[in-house]
Amino acid sequence: TLLDFDEEDGVKTKDPHIWFDVANWKLAAKAVYEGLAKADPAHKEDYKKRYDAYLTKLDETDAYVKAQAESIPKESRVLVTAHDAFNYFGEQFGLEVKAIQGVSTDSETGTKNISDLANFIVQRNIKAIFVESSVPKKSIEALQEAVKAKGKEVKIGGELYSDSLGDETHNTETYIKTVKANADTIVNALK
C-alpha cells in the first residue's frame, strides 16, 4: 500500500520511501524476479530459488522488527527524525512518526517546525530523537537544543539509514541488514 503525504504546496502525492515496508519490498522483489525470468528464461528456476529464499529472509526480517518494536513501551513508540522518511516503517511496526522536514530533504527547516516538535517532545516525554545518514545533523541538534530550552533533555538515539544503505563497517550494506540496524537503533534508544 502506498501512503499519501501533503507536500509543502498542499499537493497530495505518494510517499516515495516504499522500501521501509517489507511487504512493499516483497512486491519489488517479485517484479525483479519476474523481469529476470522473462529476460533470461533459461535461468528462470535459478531466479525462482533465489527469489523464494529472499522472501523467506524478508519474512524473517519482518517478524524480527515487529518483535523488536513490540518491546518498546506503547507510550514510547514515537520516532522523531529530521525528514519524513519513516512513515511506512511506522505504519508497519506501530510507531508514531514525527519529522522536522517533509518527505523531501530539499525542503527548508523552519523555526516553527522545530518549536512545534520541541513542544510535542516535551509534552509526550519522548526519550530520543534520531539523526539520519543522508541528512545533516544540524536540524536534529537544533531540535535537541529547543527541547533543552524548555527545561527537558532528549538524547540523540543514533543514526538511521533513510535514503541509502550503509556499509560493511556498520553491517548495513544490504537492505535486510539496514532494516534490522534501524530497528535495533530505534528500540535501544526508546526502551
Briefly describe each language-model feature range:
Residues 1-191:
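Extracytoplasmic metal-acquisition and chelation regions
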